[in-house]
A protein has these predicted regions:
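Alpha-helical transmembrane segments of polytopic membrane proteins
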Residues: 44-56, 112-126, 165-175
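Structural signature of transmembrane alpha-helix termini at the membrane-water interface
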Residues: 3-7, 26-37, 60-64, 87-94, ...
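Membrane-proximal helix-loop-helix units in multi-pass membrane proteins
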Residues: 62-129
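Internal transmembrane alpha-helix with an interfacial aromatic "cap," most often the third helix
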Residues: 2-6, 26, 30-45, 49-79
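Alpha-helical transmembrane segments in multipass membrane proteins, preferentially the mid-helix core
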Residues: 2-3, 61-62, 107-156
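C-terminal transmembrane-bundle signature of multipass membrane proteins
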Residues: 136-190
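Membrane-interfacial loop-to-transmembrane alpha-helix junctions, especially the N-terminal start
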Residues: 8-21, 72-77, 137-146, 189-190
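Hydrophobic alpha-helical transmembrane segments of multi-pass membrane proteins
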Residues: 19-34, 150-153
Length: 190
């Protein structure tokens, strides 16, 4: 929130919301570095590992939005019990790299590559920890946006066997929403 304007976005007065948004912005940056290093195995692997770690962090950022410390602590502990063994397993048995799909999307080969059943179960659990805090805190816009993104991800996975590569759409849509809210709604309707 800029100190030089009378219009403020109340949603962004929480440091955890900034961290939550930054997780999407950083993912866009990491994907850029994967794209420019797609043919360099070392850098491809490094940036794919960073993308994987950021994906692991996103539900934590979402859980931190919860105001009730008891619920927050319970969800964080549950998520860590799930994600730590899965992360060790993924990093131990798989070569982390990305490639270009048949429709020219970025394919994170470590995400869904060996056992689809367990990968889908893992994705559903990840999704619960990512979306439940938005529902619990009644962040309706964020929850609706998350569900819309889920539908697009599902369609993209069905069509191209890729699940990521939509971060720039997500970030730009969020920023367009906040720009319209700040520049059009607040000055004329508040």
């Amino acid at each position: 929130n800029n100190a030089y304007t009378q219009y403020k976005i109340d949603d962004l007065n929480n440091v955890y919301r900034y961290i939550f948004f930054m997780s999407f912005i950083l993912m866009q940056l990491i994907e850029y570095f994967i794209w420019i290093n797609i043919k360099n195995p070392l850098y491809n692997s490094i940036f794919t590992a960073l993308a994987t770690l950021l994906l692991i962090f996103q539900p934590i950022a979402s859980i931190m939005l919860i105001s009730d410390n008891t619920v927050k602590k319970m969800l964080l502990q549950s998520y860590l019990l799930f994600i730590v063994p899965l992360t060790i397993y993924k990093f131990d048995i798989q070569i982390l790299n990305s490639s270009v799909s048949k429709l020219n999307h970025l394919r994170w080969n470590a995400m869904f590559s060996y056992n689809y059943f367990y990968d889908i179960i893992g994705f559903i659990i990840w999704l619960f920890f990512f979306l439940f805090p938005l529902f619990y805190e009644r962040l309706t816009f964020a929850l609706m946006f998350g569900l819309l993104t889920l539908m697009l991800v599902t369609y993209n996975y069905y069509k191209d066997d890729t699940i990521g590569s939509m971060w720039c759409w997500i970030v730009n849509t969020i920023m367009i929403y906040y720009a319209a809210y700040l520049l059009l709604y607040l000055p004329f309707f508040k």
